[in-house]
From Swiss-Prot:
Gene3D superfamilies: Dihydrodipicolinate Reductase, domain 2, NAD(P)-binding Rossmann-like Domain. The active site is at residue 141. It comes from Hyperthermus butylicus (strain DSM 5456 / JCM 9403 / PLM1-5). This is Glyceraldehyde-3-phosphate dehydrogenase. NCBIfam families: GAPDH-II_archae (TIGR01546), PRK04207.1 (NF003251).
Length: 343
């Protein structure tokens, strides 16, 4: 099987997860990753046998720390077919001219503005539209969670409108410069929050409004979602739809899975690396239906949920899989993703 050659620019929260996911795929080769600082994650990459590429001006700094770079970022781009930009939000735009000069396909993250790429991407919603594109933007963690649920529900009936409240984590576990520590902060105070606008980059005709607050936790986001459909459905219909959708798990609170802390502990007990939960978690008991109205609560692990979509985005631009079903089957099998109910 011919394998697409992939590089990852950035080896932080998303980059390291995407890089390791690429290494598990049968049709992809991880050529290398980039680092700008010779820190512990650079040493970790080397320990995993991952070639590390650095800015030209940083070669000696890395060598002084005992890290021998495989080359420069420009040299990495000469060796790859696809580059996944996992740099901090807004930085991808600075790198884009470099990618274009190298003639590589580009995958950006949701921290970039939508106009950076030809298409904003979510596997369950628009995989086929992404085939053969030069550039894609994988939408943010919260948007990925919303879109998985919305595009799943839309299999039952067209979705007329969505109203959602996003309860955001304040920081990732490793972050020390973010907050709040002792407050609940509207983010933003004005309505809508940016999440609705981001959903509309994939589903432009959807009537959606979101509001968001940030709370002092690091584990996961929580969404409280109200959707109105074009025709009445039953609760059994909704449960069955979520249960049969890839990358969605129904959590039964009666088994002690009634909080994000317990979900994370369950992931630890499963032996998940970094307690990653790439699946969207929908609380089974929260699902309520009243005719055309559907309500539920869901949890999003912000560090991991976009990883499968990044892998699918690589397949889309490289045209390695022609359908969403095909790429989901390969990605989810290789990453050990679950669907159905837990525990």
């Amino acid at each position: 099987m011919a394998r697409v050659r992939v590089g990852v620019n950035g080896f932080g929260t998303i980059g390291k997860r995407v890089a390791e996911a690429i290494m598990l795929q049968p049709d992809m080769e991880l050529v290398g990753v980039t680092k700008t600082k010779p820190d512990y994650t650079a040493k970790y990459a080397v320990s995993r046998g991952i070639p590390v590429y650095v800015p030209k001006e940083s070669l000696e700094e890395f060598q002084a720390k005992g890290i021998e770079p495989a080359g420069t970022i420009e040299e990495l781009l000469e060796k790859v077919d696809v580059i996944v930009d996992a740099t901090p939000g807004g930085t991808g735009r600075k790198y884009k001219p470099l990618y274009e000069k190298a003639g590589v396909k580009m995958i950006f993250q949701g921290g970039e503005k939508a106009d950076i790429a030809e298409l904003s991407f979510s596997t369950l919603c628009n995989y086929e539209q992404a085939l053969g594109k030069t550039s894609l933007r994988v939408v943010s963690c919260n948007t990925t969670g919303l879109l998985r649920a919305i595009c799943s529900i839309s299999r039952l009936a067209p979705v007329r409108r969505v109203r959602a409240t996003i309860v955001r984590r304040a920081a990732d576990p490793k972050e020390i410069k973010r907050g709040p520590v002792n407050a609940i902060k509207p983010d933003p105070v004005k309505t809508p929050s940016h999440h609705a606008l981001d959903v509309k980059t994939v589903l432009p005709d959807l009537d959606i409004v979101t509001m968001a607050v940030v709370v002092p936790t690091t584990l996961m986001h929580v969404h409280i979602v109200y959707a109105e459909l074009e025709k009445p459905v039953t609760r059994e219909d909704v449960v069955a739809t979520f249960e049969s959708t890839p990358r969605i798990l129904l959590a039964d609170a009666s088994y002690g899975l009634a909080s994000t802390a317990e979900l994370v502990e369950y992931a630890r007990d499963l032996g998940r690396k970094r307690y990653d939960i790439p699946e969207l978690i929908v609380w089974l008991d929260s699902i309520a239906v009243n005719g055309v109205e559907v309500m539920w609560m869901q949890a999003v692990h912000q560090e991991a949920i976009v990883v499968p979509e990044n892998i699918d985005a690589i397949r889309a631009v490289a045209e390695l899989a022609k359908t969403a079903e095909e790429t989901i089957r390969i990605t989810d099998e290789r990453l050990g993703l679950l669907k159905g109910r837990i525990p």
